[in-house]
Amino acid sequence: MIQPQTYLEVADNTGARKIMCIRVLKGSNAKYATVGDVIVASVKEAIPRGAVKEGDVVKAVVVRTKKEVKRPDGSAIRFDDNAAVIINNQLEPRGTRVFGPVARELREKGFMKIVSLAPEVL
């Protein structure tokens, strides 16, 4: 459950460390983003010489949330942090590596490149 002003960890190697959600890109009046949703975010913390720098406005896809995601089989999954992967306008990851596990819901939403880069899919 990500809403505007929420800080997220960045789970890739674009150089950003923390981003803040500005807008949820899901319908005209969506309040919250969950796993697999695209958000617009501002880079709040970045390492030097990265692909993105502090203050950049980027698109990102949410890959982990603290709030549990309910699945059709009745199970639920939650993670220890809120995390996202920075993407370009074609919805492909800007980085070449993804850190930490990602949720299976990304496969259903069409983010196959992120799923293949992730070390673990839960």
Curated annotation (Swiss-Prot):
Species name for this entry? Thermus thermophilus (strain ATCC BAA-163 / DSM 7039 / HB27)
- GO cellular component term of the entry, any: cytosolic large ribosomal subunit
Query: Origin, by domain of life?
Result: Bacteria
> What Pfam families does the record point to?
Ribosomal_L14
Note the SUPFAM superfamilies from the entry.
Ribosomal protein L14
Q: What is this protein called?
A: Large ribosomal subunit protein uL14
Q: Which GO terms describe its molecular function?
A: large ribosomal subunit rRNA binding; structural constituent of ribosome
* Function description: Binds to 23S rRNA. Forms part of two intersubunit bridges in the 70S ribosome.
Q: Which PANTHER family match?
A: 50S/60S RIBOSOMAL PROTEIN L14/L23, LARGE RIBOSOMAL SUBUNIT PROTEIN UL14M
Give an example GO biological process: translation
Q: Which key words are in the record?
A: Ribonucleoprotein, Ribosomal protein, RNA-binding, rRNA-binding
